[in-house]
Amino acid sequence: MSLFAMSIRSLRKQLRQSRFFSRLYYAFGLDALPVLLQFPSYRRSQDKAIDKYASEDQLNKKKAIKRDMRKCYYQIKANPSEYFLMGLDTMSRKERAEFLTDKYMYMTMGKLIPRRVHDEEIENKVNFYNLAKDFFGRKVCCVECDADYDAFKHLALDVHDLIVKPNFAAMGSGIFAVSIDNEADARKVFEIIRGGGRGKWIIEERIKQSKEMAALNESSCNTVRYLSFLNKSGFFAITPFLRTGRKGSVVDNAGAGGIFANVDVKTGVVYTNGIDELGNEYECHPDSGIRFKGWQIPRYDEMVSTVRKMHRELMPSHPYIGWDMALTEKGWVVIECNWGQFINQYADHIGRKKEFLRYVYGK
């Protein structure tokens, strides 16, 4: 990366540190600089998306497709993958304007919540646990240095089955499950976690999900992503989605090979087929055989009540939060929260920008 590009990157970081400069940053269009300064990288992402998602006909029209991708970026900030997964490649300019892309969502939220606040309160898993521990429903410890071994050993020998997460893990990256039966195993796992001696980790008792949720896929903790909004008019939500992993996987993220399906916000009933990160569609879960459409999220009203309580008590200054919720035999617990992606648009190809803006700004 050139010195000029590094300087711009530093400037972008500084501008995001405060609410005032965040607004200036987006008002002057500095968010478009990465595409201009890192154009080779953007072109590679175009090629990767085309190879991954394009039809045979589209492969013969690469130049036109790339040109259209750039139009989508400048219109709604769509990245190359979103171009295909949202179905933007077949839409008019007017239809595309209805869709909420990741970048546009982060731009909007960046004007309301400084990025440092987002990173400290949401992305930092240890900080979030300290804030929301009453809603975790499981035992947890944090590992940052060698002095944390005793706490880790105590947890490991108490519950045996653990989920280990890097403090800033995203899309399931770096997360693994481990079973520990004795102190020797605890020491080995701790040394693996400590690795080079850097970084925080959060160690959680593995969730024992309810029988109904486990039926979808037993190896992963299957969850519901609930998108909640809090403004002066009250509490609202936009199309939640069910997330389930594949056989043998411990995570349910679409980015890690999982499958998701949209859920009716009022009834808790799944109303779309399942979709994976490649855009493949499934009437039934490929491993368990359970049909997605018509599947009822168990104890759905309890989950909504729990999310409402968390948002009002824990994050009252955040207009929008995406909550990952898991169901145990004792009730709903929170896995984590984030601003997340509106991948529900991939499943039904219905844009949710207007709805998002209405709830975020309380209009």
Could you say what each language-model-derived stretch is?
Residues 1-36:
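Intrinsically disordered, low-structural-confidence terminal and linker regions
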Residues 114-224, 232:
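Active-site nucleotide/adenylate-binding loops and adjacent lid/helix of ATP-dependent enzymes
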Residues 142-146, 242, 321-324:
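Acidic carboxylate-rich catalytic motifs and surrounding loops in phosphoryl-/glycosyl-chemistry enzymes
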Residues 162, 236, 333-335:
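Protein kinase-like catalytic core scaffold
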Residues 217, 221-305:
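ATP-dependent carboxylate/phosphate-activation module, predominantly the ATP-grasp catalytic core
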Residues 280-320, 327-363:
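C-terminal active-site "lid" helix and adjoining low-complexity regulatory extension at the edge
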